[in-house]
Amino acid sequence: MKKLFASLITALVMISGAHAAGASVTLDKFPKERLTNVAALQNGAKLFVNYCLNCHSAAFMRYNRLKDIGLTDEQIKQNLLFATEKVGETMVVSLNPKDAKEWFGATPPDLTLVARSRASHSGTGADYLYTCMRTFYRDDTRPTGWNNLVFPNVG
């Protein structure tokens, strides 16, 4: 019983610490009508593959799941696969984690489950991502020249 109580107290302390360390920015509400806007979803997939997937993997997502937003296997092959990837493979990067750490100071995280992991009392995971993507700003003090209000010192 004492171990259970100690574990509970430890968990509560950790949760409150994690809560305190969370974003102090008020999250914008993600416009829910965008979830049914197929063209916007397909454009987002293209932007993710062209820009984010160069450093960030989405290792728990397969390219063929993009059929869920109306893309065909042929469209995926023609527009989203650039090397030897196959439609049924997971979205991984060829970036060596050791090189990434050296170049960026940290290995870019896998983005597959960010929406689920960032849901909180402040908003949904979609709200977090929406706000995060909208709050980048120029910051000449950062190595990349950019910073973010939701995720300070990212990149």
Features from the language model and the residues they span:
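Structured domain cores in non-transmembrane regions
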Residues: L66-D110, V114
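Extracytoplasmic/lumenal ectodomains and periplasmic regions of secretory and membrane proteins
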Residues: G125-G155
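Short, conserved charged micro-motifs
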Residues: L71, S120-A126
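C-type cytochrome heme c attachment motif
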Residues: K46-A58, P97, T107-R116, Y128-T131
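Short, well-structured alpha-helical interface segments that form or flank functional binding sites
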Residues: A39, N43, A106, T124, ...
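Post-cleavage N-terminal segment of exported redox proteins
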Residues: M1-L35
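Short loop/turn segments at secondary-structure transitions that flank enzyme active sites
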Residues: M61, S117, T135
